[in-house]
């Protein structure tokens, strides 16, 4: 990854609210399924904005085995996704998205960020990100003191 895209808490909330406004009216949804872990915080934000109390998770782990990237489903929500929003923070190459689509073919799959390779796999997203860009999410960062350049 050659570039970095830094996401602040404020930016994330603004993007989540924009996405929530596109998902109105909220009564059309039975609930939200957040993809663990990246979709947990956006899922909480959507649940708040849409007034949805039924929130579940699908937990997927990816790991390298003989240089192949494999997905392992650790926990899944029941059903085919009908009436549910599936939320993840990002669709990148589409590996996780393909697995989600297979598990929940009737769900409405959304993300905050989308890279070109995965974009066709989601129903909606807010921000386009170049494929070679690494996203730094606010839950992965802390606020630290940065000394002045002059050193004084």
Curated annotation (Swiss-Prot):
Entries under PANTHER family matching the protein: XANTHINE PHOSPHORIBOSYLTRANSFERASE, XANTHINE-GUANINE PHOSPHORIBOSYLTRANSFERASE
Superkingdom of source: Bacteria
Reaction(s) the record says it catalyses: GMP + diphosphate = guanine + 5-phospho-alpha-D-ribose 1-diphosphate; XMP + diphosphate = xanthine + 5-phospho-alpha-D-ribose 1-diphosphate; IMP + diphosphate = hypoxanthine + 5-phospho-alpha-D-ribose 1-diphosphate
Record: residues binding 5-phospho-alpha-D-ribose 1-diphosphate: 37-38, 69, 88-96
Localization per record: Cell inner membrane
GO molecular function: guanine phosphoribosyltransferase activity; hypoxanthine phosphoribosyltransferase activity; magnesium ion binding; xanthine phosphoribosyltransferase activity
Protein name: Xanthine-guanine phosphoribosyltransferase
Residues engaged in binding xanthine: 92, 135
Membrane topology: Peripheral membrane protein
One GO cellular component term noted in the UniProt record for this chain: cytosol
InterPro entries xref list: PRibTrfase_dom, PRTase-like, Xanthine_Guanine_PRibTrfase
UniProt binding sites for GMP: 69, 92-96, 134-135
Keyword annotations of the record: Cell inner membrane, Cell membrane, Glycosyltransferase, Magnesium, Membrane, Metal-binding, Purine salvage, Transferase
EC number: 2.4.2.-, 2.4.2.22
Phylogenetic lineage: Bacteria, Pseudomonadati, Pseudomonadota, Gammaproteobacteria, Enterobacterales
Family the UniProt entry places it in: Belongs to the purine/pyrimidine phosphoribosyltransferase family. XGPT subfamily.
Subunit note: Homotetramer.
Pathway note: Purine metabolism; GMP biosynthesis via salvage pathway; GMP from guanine: step 1/1; Purine metabolism; XMP biosynthesis via salvage pathway; XMP from xanthine: step 1/1
Cofactor list: Mg(2+)
Organism: Escherichia fergusonii (strain ATCC 35469 / DSM 13698 / CCUG 18766 / IAM 14443 / JCM 21226 / LMG 7866 / NBRC 102419 / NCTC 12128 / CDC 0568-73)
Chain residues that bind guanine: 92, 135
Main location: membrane
């Amino acid at each position: 990854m050659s570039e970095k895209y830094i996401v602040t808490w404020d930016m994330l909330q603004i993007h989540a609210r924009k996405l929530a406004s596109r998902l109105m009216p909220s009564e059309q949804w039975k609930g939200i399924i957040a993809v663990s872990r990246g979709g947990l915080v956006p899922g909480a934000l959507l649940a708040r904005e849409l007034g949805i109390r039924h929130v579940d998770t699908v937990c997927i782990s990816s790991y390298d085995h003989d240089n192949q990237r494999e997905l392992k489903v650790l926990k899944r929500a029941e059903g085919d996704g009908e009436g549910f929003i599936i939320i993840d923070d990002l669709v990148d190459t589409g590996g996780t998205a393909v697995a989600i689509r297979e598990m929940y073919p009737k769900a409405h799959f959304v993300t905050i960020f989308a890279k070109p390779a995965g974009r066709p796999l989601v129903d909606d997203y807010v921000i386009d990100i170049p494929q070679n860009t690494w996203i730094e999410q606010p839950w992965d960062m802390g606020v630290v003191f940065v000394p002045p350049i002059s050193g004084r």
